Amino acid sequence: MNYAYLIYQIKDMNTDYAFMGWNFAKDRINLMDYDGVYYGRSIDGENPIAVLEKLFERFNVNHPDDFKGHSMSVSDIVVLFDDNGCKWYYCDRFDWKDITADLRGRR
């Protein structure tokens, strides 16, 4: 399946949950603290987690020349778009958390 993606990173590294795991950040997240730093298309993967792992490697090892953010890290958010809509994922310490439901109604 092909996915498009949007990477969000915290604007101000002094934000109290910057680079913190999901358990600490989940009640603090404010999407106004984030900037969309990169949009891409046509990442192929068998499932969302496989795509997120590919993106993590790409944006740490061999990021695109037009990428203006920092290496992908804990507290980054990636939105994956497919034919069924979109889902939001939080880069946690050791895995990815689907936070789509957690963000409903938040700004």
Question: Regions from the language model: what does each represent?
Answer:
Residues 1-46:
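Extended boundary segments
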